[in-house]
């Protein structure tokens, strides 16, 4: 069978390898990967499976070997750490198969990425919009990396940093810290996870002000919080943004009061988890307006009615909304 599984094996812990990847490894006649990663998957291979390992920066060679073996009729599994589509082998294999006009079937099997593992260990730091930036300038010019870092800092994204430091790249992380301090509070939480999911794992938190880049190496993932992120019992929490205790400088006092009111109402509802999000949104407004929690039992909305009305308004298809409210 002319097939290549492109498998993300997770950050390193056996329990983070998905069942689908287990199955692909068992089926493979040939497994291709960076030599360091084979220690994490050896036990899942069938007897007689051929392992082809290469060193760092030999991605094209790995891809070529995998394609050639698959074209010869073997089932091949190419492994990447984390998720194969995030700084992994998936894009390269698609590119090279396209260049060759190869008829090999490619199937990408997702894996737990290092930033996801790090986030879980740090609490809940990626509860809102986020971006991932690699600080390695091996394939991307530093000028572009810096421009992206500035954009992320200005836009208040939670930001995960990969490849923050190496022997030759020792100043880039400090530069990114400087850029973020121009747009974020010095007290912004920063989480660091070293060797995520591996025996030498280390997890700690700090702030942008106190971040010591000397503690970081190439196996460290950093997660920088946004303006709403906070530390709680040693964990980083980034609220989803719907109900916030603190408003930004631009937020009006009335909006902050409403946000706090909604948080309180939500905590007092009997069954908040059982309502569709658009119905819950309308219910919060109804209770907030009337101060009557019986609205939880009285309010009715057609399925998806609120979201459809909202979308129609955003799209400009609905220009008039008629309301009939009787206040007693």
Show which residues each predicted segment covers.
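Short, basic, glycine/proline-bearing loop/turn elements
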Residues: 1-9, 49-53, 129-135, 285-297
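Class I S-adenosyl-L-methionine
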Residues: 1-106, 212, 250-252, 302
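A contiguous loop/helix-start segment that scaffolds small-molecule binding in enzyme catalytic cores
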Residues: 4-6, 75-76, 154-251
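General beta-strand structural signal in soluble alpha/beta enzymes
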Residues: 32-34, 53, 78-80, 106-111, ...
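Glycine-rich phosphate/diphosphate-binding loops that line cofactor/substrate pockets in enzymes
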Residues: 66-73, 150-155, 305-318
